[in-house]
Each structure stands twice: as C-alpha cells, then as structure tokens.
Amino acid sequence: MIMNIAFIGMACALGLSAMGSAFGSGFAAQASVGAWKKCYANGKPAPFIMVAFSGAPLTQTIYGFLLMNFIRSAVEGGCDAMLAMFTGIFAGLAIGLSAFFQGKVAAASADALGETGKGTANYFIVIGIIETVALFTLVFSLLLLQ
C-alpha cells in the first residue's frame, strides 16, 4: 500500500511535467509556424532559431522524469510515502506550469523575432528565467525528499 501511494507521486511528477511541456511546445510551435509564414509572405528570411523556442518547454519533461526516479529512490530508502506523493503532485504541477508559461513566452518571442528580426538574446533570457522555476522546483524537491 505504501509504495502504491508513492506511485501516484511518481506518475504526477512525470505526467504533469510532460503535459506542461506538450502544451508549452504546442503554443511555441504554432507561433513559430505563423512567424515563418509571415516571413515567407513578406520575402524575409525565416529565422531557424525559432525551432529552439518551440523546443524550450521540452526540458521540463526531463526534470519530471528525474524527479520521478528520485521519488522512487527516496521511498526505497525509507522516505515517507505521503511526502513522496505530495512532492510528486505539487512539484510536477509547478514544473508543468513552468513549461506551459515558457511556451507562451516562447510563442511571443517567435512572433516578435519573426516581425522584427531582432532581440533573439533578450527572448532567450526571459525564456531561461521561466526555466529557472522548474530547476528550483526540482532541486528543492530533491532536498525535501532527503
């Protein structure tokens, strides 16, 4: 029974993170395609770097996978299963929301870059700031599970 509760946390850590990545990447990819279309329609070069905008939210799935495995190891090492479950649920949600909103910012970045051709470094900086939330969540969750 104890491990079954922990399985909920493991599933949420990965599942919620991956759902956020799917939504975020979808938003960013749609905007990238739209920006490329505008570039082609106006005879401007289409910046390939927008592929990176589209893929940025995918890293949160990796963080969810890592957290899932850390939860399993923590429970096998004697960590409370309820703590593991709730850590997986709330950390998975935080990581997933980070990916969701990172995708929205990446979508806005693709639109802006497609229209102006400028600001790439600035766009990556703000995308990276949102990534930091997921990294902090992963690290703080690992500390909580020790």
Predicted regions and their residues:
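Hydrophobic, small-residue-rich transmembrane alpha-helices and their short perimembrane loops
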Residues: 1-146
